[in-house]
Amino acid sequence: MVITMCCIVSFAAVAGPKIDTSPDRAKTALNPGLKQIGSLQPRRANEISGSNWTLGCETLDRDFADYQQYKEYIVPLGIKTIRLQGGWAKTEKVKGKYDFTWLDSIVDDACGRGLNIILETDYGNTNYVGGGGADLAGGFPTSGEALAAWDRWVEAMAAHYKGRVRDWAMWNEPDINKKHQPGDIAPFNIRTAEIIRRVIPDARIAGLSLSSSSPKLLNDCLKLLADQGKMDLFNWFIYHGYDFNPDISYQNVEELKVTLGKYSTQAKMRQGENGCPSEVATKFALSNYPWTESSQAKWDLRRMLGDLGHDVESAVFTICDFNHLGREINRKGLLWATADKQVEKIKLAYYAVQNCVAVFDDTLERVKEPVVGVVYDKSTASFAYRNKNSGRNLVVLWCNSGTPDDSFVTRPAQVVVKNLAIKEPVWVDLVSGRIYEIPADRIVKTGEFIIFKDVPLYDAPVLIAEKTLLLK
């Protein structure tokens, strides 16, 4: 029987550490030399109409994390869409028998909280000869028997979640298995997506799910899809592409968008997985670097707002640390977890992401013409946004010259905006969420320009914003 309505869930108290809702919940050493007048107010996911973000809730299919331990932290964060993985091996432990109970408990809980789900079709199943690998980098199913079994599982899963899950994604990071070439990836995407779309005609499907952000790899895969007339199966194409300095990725991102434009005017690129560790790691992306909670928070914000500024949907990887058995604990979570999956600490990045989500929702639109100029001793990124309802404006900017560090020391920047009215500007630090007054003697208005003198700037995003956008 297909369940078409989400269950109603009760919201229990958080079992782990309590979420701090005080104005100084995100504690840093920042001192910009300005008068603090307030703090950003977090917004729950059900208080936000829509936004650019997806939150990773991965690896539950392999029991590396426990949804029940972190579920109460999702809605207060403010992100409305979560990424889950389908788990063929966990669902079909006995050939021909599907037990979706484990996934139902997660999907129904998430739906009951008002969350949207993007469900990924992976990984393999060793019950079948040639059934592929059941973990990251495992190969696709290859034998005739295993491929037929894959098709049956995808169809059963799509039918089971029709009415509950509309958004779907293909097998995660097929390209990190070097046996998988475009000639393998594209046909496997086609067979999977065709089944989903037949069962759920209005499904929204993300193709490829590539680890790489290589324009050449994308082009090689898209050409095969286009040659088969299958581009219309897909609404998005996913890339990941980790970089120590998140800002250096955007030349590739723009090339990815141009590449996709050769084959489709409808589909869009989507960043499907990116995050930063909060401590030194020896395995996984961004390993062997002295990350801390401070640099993680900065990195996550720069990735989120860099993606938004380049008009790309963006994923935060991940809600909670997970114990990747046989490797090590992946510390990219916003929540710090023990080896036995218990949430022990809320990281600084949780509050930083919460601050970002509270400001940047779908009521803002990017002002695309060049309206911001920044004079600084290093390279910077900057973007301008306007509230579609009120017309009120803000600018976000940061130093993008290197990998985020642990320092909260700011240096002065001179910022010029053109044709962007900000009547009562405030300065906001997104890591801490603190809002500061900008002294009148640092603001010069001349014709269509506003000059902000000696704006505190460092390697994490800050705002110059209309006060009434943030403080009611």
Regions found by a protein language model. Name each.
Residues 77-235, 241-244:
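Substrate-binding cleft and catalytic face of glycoside hydrolase catalytic domains
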Residues 2-10:
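Bacterial N-terminal signal peptides
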Residues 373-421:
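Carbohydrate-binding surface patches
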Residues 276-360, 367-377:
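Aromatic/acidic polysaccharide-binding cleft in carbohydrate-active enzymes
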Residues 12-72, 76-77, 472:
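Mature N-terminal, pre-catalytic/accessory segment of carbohydrate-active enzymes
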Residues 416-435:
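Solvent-exposed beta-hairpin/edge-strand motifs
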Residues 437-472:
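C-terminal beta-strand-rich structural cap/linker in extracellular carbohydrate-active enzymes
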Residues 182-306, 310-314:
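Noncatalytic carbohydrate-binding groove/subsite architecture in carbohydrate-active enzymes
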